[in-house]
Regions:
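Short, Lys/Arg-enriched N-terminal segments with co-localized hydrophobic residues
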Residues: 1-15
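Conserved, structured core segments of small domains
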Residues: 16-104
Length: 104
């Protein structure tokens, strides 16, 4: 990667905002998600590799999801969430997005 590309990457990364996502899984999500899990996890890895996804996963009770994302704005993040197979297949049934300021 050329030096100018590295600077551009960090400029764009620092320009992105951070967002917290809280959502809810459907009933029996552990079983219903199985046919789509590999596709979902591959997509998340891609988002992580592109520094869009910081972290994402279910709560211990598996009723809720929690995630931290980098995005240019709320609409971009909504599109990312709704393009996920879990949203398309009804595994995730709702979500809320909150702009987040990382203190440290």
């Amino acid at each position: 990667m050329q030096l100018s590309s590295v600077y551009l990457f960090y400029y764009l990364y620092l320009k992105m905002e951070k967002f917290v996502v809280f959502g809810r899984y459907c009933q029996d999500a552990i079983f219903k998600r199985e046919p789509f899990r590999e596709q979902h996890l591959n997509r998340l890895k891609n988002l992580k590799d592109r520094d869009i996804l910081v972290t994402l996963g279910p709560t211990k009770c598996t009723k809720y999801l929690f995630g931290i994302f980098n995005a240019n704005d709320v609409n971009e993040l909504k599109d990312l969430i709704e393009e996920d197979i879990y949203w398309e297949k009804g595994i995730w049934i709702n979500y809320d997005i909150y702009p987040w300021i990382q203190a440290f």
